[in-house]
């Protein structure tokens, strides 16, 4: 009964949409939608040698059906850059002084520490996001903020000289003048 209803709806669908050909393979049926211009070669992800790419117009029955997941059209991601401790030290030192850099300042810092201006720009963007996120998390859970800041400070380069100091002498430590001006 269900099959006869389905078959009836299929016949009705074909009568109302005579240009739909459901018996064609997906490549021929949708070739014009996915490939407005014929592609002759593609580069597999792990090769610099082009391989023949099936042309939508010239598909024959001996070829395997087209599987879009087997072809990668996206660009490769660049490798992740690992900064040296000296570079991180300078980036963090400058970030504490200034959260945003102008293009000339960015270029000067990049030249000074041996990075590209784009790398410096991205590092500053990421660091602003991280500090904003950590401040938001510390507002939501004040009891865990002291543990979070102490564990993250131990992972940072030169954290003992640049982390906020909590002391009994009223904050008169040598490096506390910069930190007292910032909202906590």
Curated annotation (Swiss-Prot):
One GO process term, biological-process aspect: cell differentiation
- Keywords assigned by UniProt, alphabetized: Developmental protein, DNA-binding, Homeobox, Nucleus
Q: Where is this region: Disordered?
A: 1-29, 129-184
Low complexity composition-biased segments: 140-161, 174-184
GO function terms (MF aspect): DNA-binding transcription factor activity, RNA polymerase II-specific; RNA polymerase II cis-regulatory region sequence-specific DNA binding
Return the SUPFAM superfamilies for the record: Homeodomain-like
The record's function comment reads: May play a role in patterning the gut.
Record-linked PANTHER family: HOMEOBOX PROTEIN NKX (PTHR24340), MUSCLE-SPECIFIC HOMEOBOX PROTEIN TINMAN-RELATED (PTHR24340:SF41)
Give the record's family classification. Answer: Belongs to the NK-2 homeobox family.
In Swiss-Prot or TrEMBL terms, this protein is called Homeobox protein LOX10
Q: Which gene encodes it?
A: LOX10
């Amino acid at each position: 009964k269900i099959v006869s209803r389905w078959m009836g709806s299929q016949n009705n669908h074909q009568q109302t949409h005579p240009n739909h050909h459901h018996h064609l393979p997906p490549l021929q049926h949708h070739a014009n939608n996915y490939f407005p211009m014929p592609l002759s070669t593609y580069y597999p992800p792990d090769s610099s040698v082009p391989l023949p790419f099936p042309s939508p117009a010239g598909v024959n029955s001996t070829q395997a059906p087209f599987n879009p997941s087997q072809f990668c059209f996206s660009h490769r991601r660049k490798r992740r850059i690992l900064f040296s401790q000296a570079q991180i030290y300078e980036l963090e030192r400058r970030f504490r002084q200034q959260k945003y850099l102008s293009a000339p300042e960015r270029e000067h810092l990049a030249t000074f520490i041996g990075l590209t201006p784009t790398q410096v720009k991205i590092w500053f963007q990421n660091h602003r996001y991280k500090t904003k996120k950590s401040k938001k998390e510390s507002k939501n859970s004040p009891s865990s903020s002291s543990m979070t800041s102490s564990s993250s400070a131990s992972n940072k380069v030169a954290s003992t000289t640049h982390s906020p100091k909590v002391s009994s002498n009223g904050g008169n430590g040598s490096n506390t003048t910069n930190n007292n001006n910032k909202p906590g």
